[in-house]
Amino acid sequence: MRLGLSMLFCLGEPFLTAIKCLDKIGVDHIEIVDEGLHALNSRRVSMLKRTFSGKGISLSVHAPFADINIASTSPTIRRAVMKRLKKSMEFSAQLNPECWVFHPGIRSAVSDALRNLDWEINLKSTHELLREAEKYGLRITVENVPEPFPFLLKKVKEFERFYEALGEDGLNLGITFDVGHANINGEINEFIKRFGSKIVHIHVHDNNGDFDAHLGVGFGSINWVEVISAVKKINYRGALVVESKGNIGESIQTLKKLLK
């Protein structure tokens, strides 16, 4: 397993400042967050290539997530969302990332009245994203998200239903397993056991089981010894991407000790 770091912790910094900071931290993997001040464009893609090329650092890209809902029941909004995500794929593919991570759709105020419509739109959008990914040879993954947010995919049972409905397309869709989110949902071990073969990317951050605080590793209630043991049992070979908002150095050192 390799240690990685998400740019989430420096999302409020100018892009150039963030890149210079990352270049000094000393991890094997960087996750670019295509959002806000760091939204990808041709200039930023070129900058990333110059900075990390030839250094043995692998990359992944987290798709835009602010105001993004692939299950929107408004055709106009959904078209805009899909256009933004497809543009993200286009720029991301130029970086040759290990994967591109996206969030599942969100229930809306009319979900109860329009039974299963948002679920069906979520499936439709996922199929569409998979088709787009094929154009670029891009591996895409869906992330498990936490309570209490009204996402359509949070728990194991929801993911089981989702993959069954995807059919053969589900074979091409991996999972980015977010340990912190699973802790809030009370399903860390269950999720790893059930979807071990689908997990191709892992986000690590801590919390106390009540709020998605994105604390440093070891600063919450998660038993990281058990987590690393469970991840090793599924022969995971990808990156452990620190997605904390602070205590970055401490998180990396804690993980290094656990992986010895």
Where are these regions (language model features)?
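Histidine-acidic metal/acid-base catalytic patches
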Residues: 1-2, 11-12, 16-23, 98, ...
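Active-site acidic/histidine proton-transfer and metal-coordination neighborhood
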Residues: 54, 75-174
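Generic enzyme active-site microenvironment
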Residues: 29, 60, 141-142, 176-179, ...
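N-terminal pre-domain/capping segments
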Residues: 1-89, 93, 259-260
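Active-site-proximal loop/turn and secondary-structure-junction residues that shape catalytic pockets
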Residues: 9-11, 34-36, 65-67, 104-108, ...
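Soluble or luminal CAZymes and related metallo-dependent hydrolases
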Residues: 14, 40, 44, 80-84, ...
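Residue-level detector of anion-binding/catalytic polar loops
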Residues: 28-29, 58, 98, 139, ...
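Catalytic-core regions built around general acid/base machinery
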Residues: 43-56, 125-132, 191-194, 226-230
